[in-house]
Amino acid sequence: MERYVFDYRKLNGRIGEVFGSQKEYAKALGVSDSTVSKKLSNKAYFSQKEIEKTVDILGINPGSITAYFFTM
């Protein structure tokens, strides 16, 4: 089975703008820094719940979800 590789640069930039660090974003998301690191490096996928919470805490327009999470 082929594994999809997503480009999270836009998401990473927004995390930096809002939280200043991946560690602070991880706290707000309710997961460990290492979990976020795995997700942003395509070693693990974001769950639907994590995407929904991220959209909320980062103030992402729901119409822009694809640009942040599903760009390949």
Language-model segment annotations:
Residues 19-38:
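Short alpha-helical DNA-recognition segment
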